[in-house]
Every structure is written in structure tokens, then in C-alpha cells.
């Protein structure tokens, strides 16, 4: 039986962890043994139950944070394939293993085209057999990491057919959350950290003026503190609701008129955007990562034409977007058309794409 090892940064909820989960699930029907090792947050194994449920061949899920532990374990187990994503201990162990004649076939999942992301793998680029890119940044990989083959696998996974949230359900969701049943509600739902730059969401909402603001999702401590200070100085301070992490985010999405993302940088196309769109919630998002290659302005969402430079969305762009969207949000009939476009685009996005088959095809030489 072939042994496939997935080495990942962490197992708490996040976009990269969703990709890991779907990669593991893609091998469920094959006669292979699967191990998962990770390096950070040993007490946050959020996705472990679903990993085991989606693939009964998961034999072990191990916290192996350091180089020596990863080296010893890999040397002992000698897997048939290593699928790696941002596990520093494993990355440091691989050259030492190779020097001792233990050459492990390796595929690396790349979520972003940024130098900071690709540069992590420069030290092992000659030991990588395949790069797994979430969107087409092959040229950057060739330039910075060398000639190993690239497979383009978008993280678009089958989802239950969602329906557009009707007005009455939106009112019920707002009442349940303590928001006004009428009026404009904009916000962000998902992991809240420095990269997501929630201060940009606040600035956009301030420029809209007559609105309520909603945040839902786990807040990274430093970002939460910065958001506290930002809201304390904002006229929206008393009209902002922060729900923190929730077991089910459906109510938060349902309450929104507009989903606002102001990330400094992103990967292919964040799952949260899909979750908003498929419910009929139009999105406002920056042209970073793969977002601008997928979302067309006015067809379910609106784009902030931001340079892909890992910096905050410029204030002028946020203010201009608010000026553009304010009259659209105020026109219920017109906004209903944008809701319908969002729903149609969001549900079609994942319907006919088989990421699992593409993943198995990319790994087929070792399966």
C-alpha cells in the first residue's frame, strides 16, 4: 500500500486548510495510507474530524513542529509521496534526508505568486517533483523556483446548491443577531488577521455613512486590538457588531447587503467570497491574487483595482467605491438585480469543476 504524507502548517480553520482537507478527501477511494503532520497550534485541530470522516484511510494526524522530529519521522517512514505546504520543519529536513540517500518524491502546494511565499521553497526547489498552483502563476514559479512541472488546480470544490437569501430570511437573521431589520448592513465574514486588513472595511463603511457594520470570524489578537482602536475613533463604533468565531456563519452572511473584503493580498479566490455570492450577497474585493481573474466587475461583485503589492487598499479607492455603490444599495430593485447576478455567478463557479480529479491526475505518477 502506498503511503502519502501531507505536511501542513496548521489544522485550524482557514483557506489553506480547506485545500488540505479537499486534497486528502480526493484520495479517499484509492488504496493508499494517508498521514497528516503539522507544525503550529497543536491545540487547534479544527479540521481533524472532517479529515478522518472524508478519508477513512487517514492513519495518523501528528504534531511534528521541528526539523529533527520531521527528519526522524520521515527517515523512518519513508513515504512514497510528500505533499508539502508551509511546514518549515519538513522543508529544513528534506536536504538532510537527501544527503543521506533518502530522496522522497515531493509535491508542493503553492497558494500565492508573491515572492515572500515562493521564496520559502527556494532551498528545496531541486528536490520538488511537482508544483501544485492554485491559479496560473507558472511564469513566476519558473523564474524563482526552476523547471519542475506545474499543475494548475483551482480550489473550487463541490458545494450543496445554495439558494438566494430572500428578504424575509434576511430580516430574521438580522433580528437574531441584534441588527436593524431594515437599512444597509455591510461587513466581512471569515478569518480576521493583518493580511485581511479589516480597517479597510471600516473606512469603506464610514464613506457609505448611513450603514451598519458586521464582522464575524476568529480575530487574531493583534488585529483585534488594532480594530478596537480603529472603531473607538470611528462614527460607526456604536453601529458595529463583532460576533467573533461562530460554529455556523450562515446567519452572518444572510444578514449582509454587501460583503466587503479589503485584503492586502490573497490566493486564488477566497472561499468566503463564494459563500457570500452563492447566497446572493454581492461582494466588493480587491484585484489581488487570482480574484481579478475570476470576478468581473458588475457581474455579481465589484472590484477595487488595487496594485498587487501586499499593501493596504488605498483610501481613495475605498471612498470612490463607496460613492459608486451608495446609490445602488439605496435602490432596492436595482440591488435585487445585483443579488441575482451574485447568486448565479457564485453557484456556477464550482458546479462544473473537478478539482479532486485534477489533483489525482497531478499525483498519478506516485499513486
Where are these regions (language model features)?
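Glycosyltransferase donor-sugar binding loop
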Residues: 36-44, 189, 212-226
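A charged, aromatic-enriched C-terminal amphipathic alpha-helix characteristic of glycosyltransferases
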Residues: 316, 330-364
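A conserved mid-protein helix/loop that constitutes part of the nucleotide-sugar donor-binding site
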Residues: 17-25, 184, 188-207
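Nucleotide-activated donor-binding/catalytic signature segment of Leloir-type glycosyltransferases, i.e.
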Residues: 55-59, 226-245
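A conserved, positively charged/aromatic
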Residues: 102, 106-136
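Short hydrophobic beta-strand element within catalytic cores of glycosyltransferases
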Residues: 282-285, 295
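Short His-centered aromatic/hydrophobic patch
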Residues: 84-90
Amino acid at each position: 500500500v502506498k503511503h502519502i504524507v501531507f505536511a501542513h502548517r496548521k489544522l485550524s480553520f482557514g483557506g489553506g486548510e480547506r485545500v488540505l482537507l479537499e486534497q486528502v478527501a480526493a484520495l479517499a477511494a484509492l488504496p493508499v495510507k494517508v498521514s497528516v503532520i503539522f507544525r503550529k497550534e497543536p491545540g487547534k485541530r479544527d479540521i481533524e474530524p472532517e479529515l478522518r470522516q472524508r478519508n477513512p484511510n487517514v492513519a495518523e494526524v501528528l504534531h511534528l513542529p521541528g526539523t529533527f522530529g520531521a527528519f526522524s519521522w520521515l527517515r523512518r517512514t519513508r513515504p512514497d509521496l510528500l505533499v508539502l505546504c508551509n511546514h518549515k520543519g519538513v522543508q529544513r529536513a528534506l536536504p538532510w534526508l537527501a544527503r543521506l540517500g533518502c530522496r522522497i518524491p515531493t509535491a508542493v502546494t503553492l497558494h500565492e505568486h508573491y515572492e515572500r511565499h515562493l521564496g520559502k521553497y527556494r532551498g528545496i526547489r531541486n528536490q520538488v517533483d511537482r508544483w501544485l498552483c492554485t491559479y496560473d502563476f507558472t511564469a513566476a514559479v519558473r523564474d524563482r523556483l526552476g523547471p519542475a512541472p506545474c499543475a494548475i488546480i483551482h480550489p473550487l470544490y463541490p458545494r450543496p446548491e445554495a439558494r438566494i437569501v430572500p428578504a424575509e430570511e434576511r430580516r430574521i437573521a438580522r433580528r437574531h443577531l441584534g441588527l436593524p431589520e431594515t437599512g444597509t448592513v455591510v461587513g466581512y465574514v471569515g478569518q480576521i488577521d493583518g493580511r485581511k486588513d479589516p480597517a479597510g472595511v471600516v473606512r469603506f463603511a464610514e464613506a457609505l455613512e448611513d450603514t451598519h457594520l458586521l464582522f464575524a470570524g476568529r480575530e487574531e489578537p493583534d488585529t483585534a486590538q488594532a480594530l478596537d482602536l480603529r472603531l473607538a475613533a470611528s462614527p460607526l463604533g456604536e453601529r458595529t457588531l463583532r460576533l467573533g468565531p461562530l460554529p455556523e456563519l450562515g446567519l452572518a452572511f444572510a444578514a449582509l447587503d454587501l460583503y466587503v473584503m479589503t485584503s492586502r493580498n490573497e490566493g486564488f479566490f477566497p472561499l468566503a467570497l463564494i459563500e457570500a455570492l452563492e447566497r446572493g450577497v454581492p461582494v466588493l474585493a480587491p484585484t489581488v491574487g487570482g480574484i481579478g481573474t475570476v470576478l468581473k466587475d458588475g457581474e455579481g461583485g465589484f472590484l477595487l483595482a488595487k496594485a498587487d503589492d501586499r499593501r493596504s487598499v488605498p483610501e481613495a479607492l475605498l471612498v470612490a467605491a463607496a460613492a459608486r455603490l451608495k446609490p445602488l444599495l439605496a435602490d432596492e430593485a436595482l440591488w435585487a438585480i445585483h443579488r441575482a447576478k451574485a447568486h448565479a455567478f457564485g453557484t456556477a463557479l464550482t458546479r462544473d469543476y473537478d478539482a479532486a480529479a485534477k489533483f489525482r491526475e497531478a499525483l498519478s505518477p506516485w499513486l
